[in-house]
């Protein structure tokens, strides 16, 4: 289907995944978000799309059948132009007007009430548990790709795109923030779904602080800021397959969570530390986090 079906309304922003446009579907009157990406022309099956792109898009389309309320919907995929070397593909997503960054900035002082944060976290974790149950690692969770509708529904965006976009990102170097990255990613070790739970922890703290938790300017600086809070991890937890040794960091013990997030109650601080656990094998999962007492205390009407 051609993107000419959609009427462009405004440029939303430029990120690691290229320019995003807000557009209108004249048939339904609904707004959509258009994200274009260049992929190498693979020739052959799939109309020239590389088989990896075909697989990734097929997975995203398969998730659509579940219509999970906390995941942004992929409405359409269109090949819009092609040359011998590359094909431009446009992904058509449902449009949500604000991201979590905007939502947090709009909250009047002293910030979001604890009950609102718990509600956002429950939705966030439900969406992430759904992705992880379908073997999707987001890899780039941050407030800019967690969307919040005007009715307060949280929707995760930009998941499943990392491999689709690998070609374009190699062509267009973009500074990607390190602030939400798990230690195993910063150390360039192997990683899986626990990387997302580290990012969730950083974002959870930010909902209270209204500013990022760890603001490093390099991988080593980011790790140093992490260890300032959680302490230098034991040798047994340090990954074996990395070039940066544990000895590069001075020994230090953990600090109380309340020193950086004073507004957080004790059970919330416990949950945060389970998310910010250095060893990914010991880090809490989205499924287990949803069972945590912090998210069930003072819960409103059952859903």
Swiss-Prot record:
Residue numbers carrying N-acetylalanine: 2
Residues binding ATP are 12-20, 35
EC supergroup of this enzyme: transferase
* GO annotation, biological process: cell division; cellular response to interleukin-4; cellular response to ionomycin; cellular response to lipopolysaccharide; cellular response to phorbol 13-acetate 12-myristate; G1/S transition of mitotic cell cycle; positive regulation of cell population proliferation; positive regulation of fibroblast proliferation
Superkingdom, natural source: Eukaryota
List of residues that carry Phosphothreonine: 172
Q: What outcome is documented for mutating residue 172 to E in this protein?
A: Retains moderate enzyme activity
InterPro entries referenced in this protein's UniProt entry, alphabetically: CDK, Kinase-like_dom_sf, Prot_kinase_dom, Protein_kinase_ATP_BS, Ser/Thr_kinase_AS
Activity control: Both phosphorylation at Thr-172 and binding of a D-type cyclin are necessary for enzymatic activity. Full activation of the cyclin-D-CDK4 complex appears to require other factors such as recruitment of the substrate via a substrate recruitment motif, and/or formation of the CDKN1B ternary complex. Inhibited by INK4 family members. In resting cells, the non-tyrosine-phosphorylated form of CDKN1B prevents phosphorylation at Thr-172 and inactivation, while, in proliferating cells, tyrosine phosphorylation of CDKN1B allows phosphorylation of Thr-172 of CDK4 and subsequent activation.
The family assignment reads: Belongs to the protein kinase superfamily. CMGC Ser/Thr protein kinase family. CDC2/CDKX subfamily.
Quote the disease note of the record. Answer: Melanoma, cutaneous malignant 3: A malignant neoplasm of melanocytes, arising de novo or from a pre-existing benign nevus, which occurs most often in the skin but may also involve other sites.
Q: What is this protein called?
A: Cyclin-dependent kinase 4
Species name: Homo sapiens
Q: Which gene encodes it?
A: CDK4
């Amino acid at each position: 289907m051609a993107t000419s079906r959609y009427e462009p309304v405004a440029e939303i922003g430029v990120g690691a995944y290229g320019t995003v446009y807000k557009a209108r579907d004249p048939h339904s009157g609904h707004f959509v978000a258009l994200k274009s990406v260049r992929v190498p022309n693979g020739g052959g099956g799939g109309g020239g799309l590389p088989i990896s792109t075909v697989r990734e898009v097929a997975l995203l389309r398969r998730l659509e059948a579940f219509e999970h309320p906390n995941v942004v919907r992929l409405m359409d995929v269109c090949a819009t132009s092609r040359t011998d070397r590359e094909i431009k593909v446009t992904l058509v997503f449902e449009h949500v007007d604000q991201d979590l960054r905007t939502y947090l900035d709009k909250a009047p002082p002293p910030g979001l009430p604890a009950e609102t944060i718990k509600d956002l976290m429950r939705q966030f974790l439900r969406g992430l548990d759904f992705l992880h149950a379908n073997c999707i690692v987001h890899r780039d969770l941050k407030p800019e790709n967690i969307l919040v509708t005007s009715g307060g529904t949280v929707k995760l965006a930009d998941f499943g795109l990392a491999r689709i976009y690998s070609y374009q990102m190699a062509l267009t170097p973009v500074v990607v923030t390190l602030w939400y990255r798990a230690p195993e990613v910063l150390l360039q070790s192997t990683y899986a779904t626990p990387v997302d739970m580290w990012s969730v922890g950083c974002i959870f703290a930010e909902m209270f602080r209204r500013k990022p938790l760890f603001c490093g300017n390099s991988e080593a600086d980011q790790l140093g800021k992490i260890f300032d809070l959680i302490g230098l991890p034991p040798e047994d937890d340090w990954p074996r397959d990395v070039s940066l040794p544990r000895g590069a960091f001075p020994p230090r013990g953990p600090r109380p969570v309340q020193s950086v997030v004073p507004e957080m109650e004790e059970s919330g601080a416990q949950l945060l530390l389970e998310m910010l656990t250095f060893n990914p094998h010991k880090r809490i999962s989205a499924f287990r986090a949803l069972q945590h007492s912090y998210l069930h205390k003072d819960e409103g009407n059952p859903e």
